[in-house]
């Protein structure tokens, strides 16, 4: 497996290459084959988001408001020391990274000042990127959204290896997420759902020329609780489902469905055909422990995590709290299991599902973990030495180890030898049978 890890402490990018079963917390277990630090820029310039492009390039968004176009080149792994006598080092390629272009000034802390200046209890809010997503593959157009409510449309010129800003928009801040709707084929518009602290979910539409942005829908808060207190608003993540297809479908109304989790441990299910309030709004945890992320599991999921089903009952989902838990729930909000229970010791600051089968997790305890979402078993655990902010899986290929290759060759030779011996035994038995038949005929005569 080959992954890229954003490490907050040094503002670096780490390439980690390993096989299934790797565990750095156990000395006798399999160890990672390669861990190397790249593009280190310090704590104030850590990497928020990573987006892999189609031609061996990456978009890397940093906390200082700079987006970098990074070129990756695969080169054979070089070793600085000789292998132990009678052994060989494994042979594989590693990446060399080079920044080829940048765009700066894409964040604005001043837009967040009104949200905390009037309160003595609030900490200062720092702007950061909440999404970097491919918008139009044919045109190489990407959308970037920030916590301060800035939405940028940029173009990747693959021939010149250049980044160009096409347009910028402003929406209500703060944003904890901005999720693109990608569940239909060709569309003449782009739909985005966003929200955050005291910022109810809103759906916006960007036209195909990227010249206009308008709000098309806004959620409404649920009714007050049993003490007639306002239910706090803080959606932290959203995933779309396919449009509603039931008998009550009204064709003249917009038709979108999505699910959310909130900072206050609420699960929300929304259908715009139903109205502005959620279809369901449930407490997930008894003490309303803060939740921070959302990933959905379904039979089919798009590359950016939206569920290719119109039924809420077809999905399960994974979320994280601010303590140490990675939690898996069914569609009704019933807790199914905790990933890494007893193993994760710090806040899980990042999770993502990759290739529809791997759960990648990292956080304050500085360990990269990979789980199989079908068996829920841990595949790998690797210490990277810094708080993890983002993880992306490049490939899940296993590296063949020389010792393993030799064992396989020995097993093949043994298997061939057994087959030859079996054939020789069969031949001997055949001749013996023929001799027996001849002898029997002669005795009769």
Swiss-Prot record:
Transmembrane keyword on record: no
BP terms from Gene Ontology: ribosomal large subunit biogenesis; rRNA processing
CC annotations in GO: nucleolus; preribosome, large subunit precursor
Entry-linked InterPro entries: WD40_repeat_dom_sf (IPR036322), WDR74/Nsa1 (IPR037379)
CDD domains per UniProt: Nsa1
Keywords attached to this entry: Nucleus, Ribosome biogenesis, rRNA processing
Compartments, record wording: Nucleus, Nucleolus
Disulphide connectivity of cysteines: none
Subunit structure: Component of the pre-66S ribosomal particle.
Similarity comment text for this entry: Belongs to the NSA1 family.
Physiological role: Involved in the biogenesis of the 60S ribosomal subunit.
Protein name: Ribosome biogenesis protein NSA1
Organism: Vanderwaltozyma polyspora (strain ATCC 22028 / DSM 70294 / BCRC 21397 / CBS 2163 / NBRC 10782 / NRRL Y-8283 / UCD 57-17) (Kluyveromyces polysporus)
Phylogenetic classification of the source organism: Eukaryota, Fungi, Dikarya, Ascomycota, Saccharomycotina
